[in-house]
Amino acid sequence: MSPNSKGVEILSIGTELLLGNITNTNAQWISEQLSQLGLNHFRQSTVGDNRDRIIKVIQEISQRSNLLITTGGLGPTPDDLTTEAIATSFNVSLFERPHLWDEIKQKTSNSKLQDNSSSLRKQCFFPKNAQIINNPRGTAPGMIWEPIKGFTILTFPGVPSEMKTMWKETAFDFIKTKFSDSYSFFSKTLKFSGIGESSVAEKINDLLNLKNPTVAPYANLGEVKLRITARAKNEVEAKNIIKPVKEKLKKKFPKFIFGEDNDTLPSVLIKELAKRNETIVFAESCTGGLLSSSITSISGSSQVFQGSIVSYSNELKNSLLNISEDNLKKYGAVSEEVCEAMAINIKNRLGADWAIGVSGIAGPNGGSQEKPVGLVYISIAGPNNHITNIKKKYNSTRNRIEIQTLSVNVCLNSLRLILLSNSK
């Protein structure tokens, strides 16, 4: 798309999106695709299932953009209004495509959907000169249509699997041929743990002002990401643009950067333990198995993960982890002493190289002035039962899942740093 072009917009149609009943993953995915094509995507809109509002938005977009991509509203129900609204926006009629009706009947021949033939048939009507985008995964086709000179509309159903298939099989090549210039965007994402977004941003002010590549920080729960994006003619050229910035960042944050792109803390930790031929076990209380789940969600975790004990009650801490009743009474289940014993005892019982014990108060109830909600103890037992103890106090305004998730991240990142300092 030339520098003087108006750009691309995404219009998501569906009242369920406005009400927050479902997450709009379609717009995110399409945005990524447009970035890869190097297109000037500058606006996203969402509108409910209201014919007049859809028409108004489409007419506005047609005056300021070259390309509109819509999702949703192509189905057989009365509130599926997209195709009709688009046609009305440009004062044209819809005409039936008989071959589409034959295809829909074939797709629904063994389904109760065919009983609702009049509703299904509405999906076969399009403007006269529109190009059909076939839908191999559903009954609602999309279209490519240029209602006025210099403005093209592509429509897709709202079902993500259907939309993605149609995009890959038809739309991608069309958009690339008609709208994309010889440049594309390529990105590399660096992932940080143990440092906040503002702290990262303060240390890279000079990089945040770069034009090509651009550097942008953004944060998830317990994790910061830096996306380095280059505009280039090909991937090799982009990598050469990105490389010096990436190397500078890795020198500036040698301990905080744990991975790139699709890396996760669990996957990085599994890879490091496997390289060392070492194993790990967990004794969990406040995280309730979330730590174990984070590891076992990664393929290949069986190489290093032997198992865990989720000892939520004091009785199980005593019977399964051999935590003495005296220590439980003296220090309490949420204490450094008990957490340390949890890690050491499960390590020795299961014969692993490493063990992590975690105990705390995830809330919203159960806290006290001495031990408030958000207090978490983590103990990591290594070779020769060497212990590393960590105490975290999370803000009590955080909810239960956030405290558990942050605790899991600290467990994994703390062990990663220990392994990093003891590289074999």
From Swiss-Prot:
Belongs to the CinA family. This is CinA-like protein. It holds the Pfam family CinA. HAMAP family: CinA_B. It comes from the Bacteria. CDD domains: cinA. InterPro entries: CinA, CinA-like_C, CinA_C, CinA_KH, Competence-induced_CinA, MoaB/Mog-like_dom_sf, MoaB/Mog_dom. Disulfide bonds: none annotated. SUPFAM superfamilies: CinA-like, Molybdenum cofactor biosynthesis proteins.
